[in-house]
């Protein structure tokens, strides 16, 4: 799950792997009107056949990637919690910007 500073209400479900990283990730998006002012539940379901991204009570994923022998989805992954700004993904930073906060209530992993 990624947020861009210049599009704060658009949620990106993104997978980075060989050939799909940097400026060419495998990503899907959804929009939440209050993404920066309310807590939300972000969910990733990683099954043997696919990885799917959900937010809040969605019953249909906003992004899903099927597994194949060419993809590294049968190996361990890292969960990255990141508050990044600027660059090619985040866009230019307002010169009047002084600070921001990323609040995480909890992280739960099931196996």
Regions found by a protein language model. Name each.
Residues 1-111:
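GH16 jelly-roll
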